[in-house]
């Protein structure tokens, strides 16, 4: 296992004794690409009771140590190496936003297990399976796992190179955002900027992904930032809109539940009424049916 020195965007993982593995899931060693710490997660028997494929995912390592609201956008590919020259390796590629709620992503059905384990497949050599992952980190929100050697100055704020482009665009769109910010300590300035970036990321998320606690924390952060001189009327407006949508969502779900209960009662009543109707129909049919000759000997005296 280890980084491919010829290409720092790649990592190779060799799984030994693949066919005889008993573990449901296994992890690779951690590795660093583009300042982010990763690891691979594999399910040798498939990540599904019905699966007959190798399942493989890219996982953000030590994600619990990253700040609230962290996200990273990455394009990556998995290659299952075939060692027979005339046969093709299996490669799949995808792109994903990794975040607190979804810190791993990949393919549940990567390659059929029967194909991997076939004697002449070329994928297993002495029982070893080689996987190569190639990653291109497109954007990072929140701190990296690995410190970058240099920070960049954007309007007096020291930010990571991966954050610089976004922070520059933020000042271009809102040039007066920090004109009244008076704190001089660079560590504190960087801290407040990171809080602002996390707050913006919270507002950008779908209301369905945001909890009431997230909103409460967001308003506390907003108040702290504005108290220290940030001009964030536009951000408060966005946060209020998210809150309104969240309230509408909650009200709508409550009403849906109420309507569902009412509908259940109505269906039960309809079922009872249908049963009563069927009974009345049967009684009516019985009432209008002609009397037979054997009915209680009523017609015996006439014959």
From Swiss-Prot:
Residues 8-135 form the MATH domain. Pfam families: MATH_2. PANTHER family: MATH DOMAIN-CONTAINING PROTEIN, TRAF-LIKE SUPERFAMILY PROTEIN. Keywords: Coiled coil. Residues 231-287 form a coiled coil. The keyword Coiled coil applies. This is MATH domain and coiled-coil domain-containing protein At3g58250. Signal peptide: none annotated. InterPro entries: MATH-CC_domain_protein, MATH/TRAF_dom, TRAF-like. CDD domains: MATH (cd00121).
